[in-house]
């Protein structure tokens, strides 16, 4: 089972929304048994970021981890949502 | 997809608890984002909804983790900070007389002209997920955002909240 981290700056507002949407999407696509979801704030995760397989962030991340982080903002604005889900799906099935 | 309009929202005396203190600004005059954020945070502080460190928290957080969102051609921002600076959950609302620049969430470089600000003073996440999801549903609807921007009074605002079932 892959570990999927969803993080934002405070761990209470935007990551809550994104977690809810990702959970719904996982269920709709029958992927809920393939991933375990974690919701947190960025400051608590940077030191152990390598423990996760997939990372979605609504907030800015340091340059050194940028390549492995999926931008979660499309789930807040609705623009670019499908592409974002495709990215997650690719990583789940990889 | 689960429809948000069918879900329950916590209410106090018939009114959603997140807007019950009327921390609202219609056509707020602000020189820049810091000025707008200060005025809104001060209002929350004066109503004893947040601690004295809330303003500083919001301003610092906005610089590190910007909260501007571009919804089509519409710009809005959802500034917030850690929950330990919040006494009672509330959302402050402002429509701006002239848009101010915010940096985009999740993107360090681009800016967006913001004409609506929802300042979130929130506690634990479980209590507010329904409300947050509904709010986000509204944020994805440019027509509704325009209606929020056109609110001229508390009456207009109340009516709109009721219409979108946030009241």
Locate the predicted segments by residue.
Chain B
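Cytosolic covalent-transfer regions centered on His/Cys nucleophiles
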Residues: 1-167
């Amino acid at each position: 089972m892959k570990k999927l981290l969803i993080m934002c700056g405070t761990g209470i507002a935007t990551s809550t929304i994104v977690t809810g949407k990702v959970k719904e999407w996982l269920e709709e696509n029958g992927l809920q048994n393939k991933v375990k979801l974690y919701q947190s704030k960025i400051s608590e995760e940077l030191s152990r970021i390598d423990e996760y397989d997939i990372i979605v962030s609504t907030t800015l991340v340091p340059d050194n981890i940028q390549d492995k982080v999926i931008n979660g903002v499309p789930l807040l604005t609705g623009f670019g949502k499908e592409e974002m889900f495709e990215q997650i799906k690719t990583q789940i099935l990889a | 997809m689960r429809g948000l309009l069918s879900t329950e929202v916590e209410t106090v005396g018939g009114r959603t608890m997140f807007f019950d203190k009327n921390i609202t600004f219609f056509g707020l005059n602000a020189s820049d984002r810091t000025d707008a954020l200060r005025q809104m945070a001060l209002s929350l502080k004066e109503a004893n909804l947040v601690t004295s460190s809330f303003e500083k928290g919001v301003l610092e957080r906005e610089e590190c983790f910007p909260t501007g969102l571009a919804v089509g051609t519409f710009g809005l921002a959802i500034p917030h900070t850690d929950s330990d600076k919040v006494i009672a959950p509330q959302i402050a609302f402002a429509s701006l007389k002239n848009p101010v620049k915010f940096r985009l969430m999740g993107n360090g470089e681009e800016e967006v002209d913001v004409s609506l600000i929802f300042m979130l003073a929130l506690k634990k996440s479980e209590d507010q997920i329904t409300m947050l999801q509904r709010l986000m549903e509204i944020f994805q609807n440019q027509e509704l955002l325009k209606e929020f921007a056109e609110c001229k009074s508390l009456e207009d605002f109340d009516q709109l909240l009721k219409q979108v079932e946030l009241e």
